[in-house]
């Protein structure tokens, strides 16, 4: 992964108010972490373009933002459902053994017996630990993201090894 690779951190939703503000669905945790990045890359009409964040505030369960040169609801409407990204280099460094969720999605999951369980489709945050949503052609599995269950993660080989019975 290169520092200039894009990481999707949210999606523009719909216009909010009369001055060009836009509701945002944040993929970050906490959701207002997205506001820590002053320039976003917006995928508009299948092309990435930089837009500067002028202001933003929490309006649970959404954020609302004001982006540069978007000053009315008609202009804001053109950006509905556009993806928001930042460059990977703008993300903070992680401690050894920590991962961004975006890096785990799409990885193959096998158990310690070498049985393929599927691929990581998404993650769920729960009160006690995160959960991997692992999908295969046959089924969906919810695998706890704990130190006992997760045996190893290899981002280069794109594989997660888990201590998990294939029948669960």
From Swiss-Prot:
Statement: the UniProt record of this protein carries the keyword Phosphoprotein: no
Q: Name one GO molecular function term.
A: ribosome binding
Compartments where located: Cytoplasm
Name the Gene3D superfamilies for this protein.
PRC-barrel domain (2.30.30.240), RimM (2.40.30.60)
The answer to keyword rRNA processing applying to this record is: yes
GO biological process, alphabetically ordered: ribosomal small subunit biogenesis; rRNA processing
Per UniProt, the keywords (alphabetical) are:
Chaperone, Cytoplasm, Ribosome biogenesis, rRNA processing
Where would you say this protein principally sits, based on its record? cytoplasm
Q: Which residues form the PRC barrel domain?
A: 96-168
So which domain of life are we looking at?
A: Bacteria
Q: Supply the Pfam families for this chain.
A: PRC_RimM (PF24986), RimM (PF01782)
Q: Which SUPFAM superfamilies match?
A: PRC-barrel domain, Translation proteins
Q: Name one GO cellular component term.
A: cytoplasm
Domain notes for this protein = The PRC barrel domain binds ribosomal protein uS19.
Biological role stated in the UniProt entry: An accessory protein needed during the final step in the assembly of 30S ribosomal subunit, possibly for assembly of the head region. Essential for efficient processing of 16S rRNA. May be needed both before and after RbfA during the maturation of 16S rRNA. It has affinity for free ribosomal 30S subunits but not for 70S ribosomes.
* Assigned protein family: Belongs to the RimM family.
Oligomer status and interactors: Binds ribosomal protein uS19.
Protein name according to UniProt: Ribosome maturation factor RimM
In its UniProt entry, the species of origin is given as Coxiella burnetii (strain Dugway 5J108-111)
Which lineage ranks, top first, belong to the organism behind this chain?
Bacteria, Pseudomonadati, Pseudomonadota, Gammaproteobacteria, Legionellales
Q: Which gene encodes it?
A: rimM
């Amino acid at each position: 992964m290169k520092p200039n690779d894009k990481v999707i951190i949210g999606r523009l939703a719909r216009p909010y108010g009369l001055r060009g503000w836009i509701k945002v669905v944040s993929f970050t945790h906490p959701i207002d972490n997205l506001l820590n990045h002053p320039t976003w890359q917006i995928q508009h009409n299948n092309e990435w373009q930089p837009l500067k964040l002028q202001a933003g505030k929490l309006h649970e369960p959404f954020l609302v933002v004001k982006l540069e040169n978007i000053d009315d609801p008609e202009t804001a409407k053109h950006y509905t459902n556009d993806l928001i990204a930042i460059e990977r280099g703008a993300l903070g460094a992680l401690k050894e053994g920590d991962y961004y969720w975006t890096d785990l999605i799409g990885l193959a999951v096998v158990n310690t017996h070498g049985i393929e369980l599927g691929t990581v489709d998404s993650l769920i945050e729960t009160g006690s630990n995160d959960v991997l949503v692992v999908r295969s052609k046959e089924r969906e599995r919810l695998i706890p993201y704990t130190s006992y269950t997760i045996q190893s993660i290899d981002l280069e080989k794109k594989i997660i090894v888990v201590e998990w019975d294939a029948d669960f």
